Amino acid sequence: MTFSLPSGDLQTTCVNIMDGFFYMLGIFLVGFASVIISGLTYSFFYVILPMIQRANPHNPLWVSLHISFVAFLLINVLSNYFLCISAKHKGPLYDKVIRELAEATGFCHPETPQDVLQYKKDFEDRMIFRIQRRQARRVEARQEQQQVASSNSAETSGVTQRKTNGESTASNPANSTSIPQPQQKKPAMPVRRWLIMGPHEWGFCDTSHQPKPPRSHFDHVTKQLVLNMDHYCPWMFNTVGYFNYRYFCNFLLFTVIGMTYGASLTWYPFSAVRSKEYHDQITLSREQHSDEILHMYDYVPIPRERTAIAFSFLLCISVGLAVSVLFGFHTYLLLTAQTTIEFHGNCANRRRAKKMNKKYKNPYDLGMKRNFQQVYGSGNPLLAIIIPSNREPEFLPLPIPGKEGFRPRNVGKKGQEEDALVPNIV
């Protein structure tokens, strides 16, 4: 039985259906995230905060600290969530950054349609040459391996003579190793053009029909060419890239802090639901002929609070664990100057370099400090995280050492390190 890939039209239809699905999923998940945030906020102010007040009747400062901390978390979560959703990957600011990046990299950006067509032709010719050269090298390497294998086979193989009733017979040809077995030719794998381009090299986007800056990719869900594209996030209903990566990381950070804080507040009330104190409250309240179940123990909920406590605790634990893993991964990416797409490409480059007995280095890695500044700016790092701000990025999308990496309006500011790049393997 043979299998064949679907036709191009069918593949395009399937891709369009999946893109539409993820787009609609984003609308649902944004609403779902709003429900989660609203539910946890309600649980704190109407269930958990009264517990804290009853347990600390003579310590209003402690209660005020809890309220202030929750307000601080809410402001940062909501503001960064909104800024990440509303970030635009096109428009005047995008065009401005593109021109600044072209000037910094010495790229002559085509302005007229004729210039764009000419650049597209030149780029395609350059890519065809590189792909053909790469395929030729693979063919040469494969031929060398076959020659070595055939030479070894010829030295070790031979005809085995057997004598039966005085006659010499040859061994079974089926068992002879000298006869080469037919091998099915493996189909050539498609080559991603950005993997054979230089780290500072501009490309061309066949979908949006415009020059493609380094580190940029076309997002098929939002139909935009995104600078420093990391991934499309349906929870954000947007693509995470150059203009909103800071907001995305901040949202993950404060979500992890908020979920950890919420789990620490609700774990005892949640575990107390099965305790003796919980049932004693119900029994004593009924013995006193009270219309409602009374609170008689600190941080022990009553039946009508049980659902809110269970909802808050289980949600904080599950969401907190999931977001913690994601936040840890993106912290690693941020400090090593990688996007999620580049992370997978760098893994492939490391494997290729290892086969060549070489060591691969990410060409965008300027050191942890400068990598952090590429996203958060050269100002106070703590203030850059805890104070929500919609300021424009301070550095160019492409990490460049020294003052050349700053956008023109930021040249001369603090933080002009002179870290040197180590060229990668191309």
Please describe what each predicted stretch is.
Residues 2-426:
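Membrane-associated feature with strongest affinity for ZDHHC
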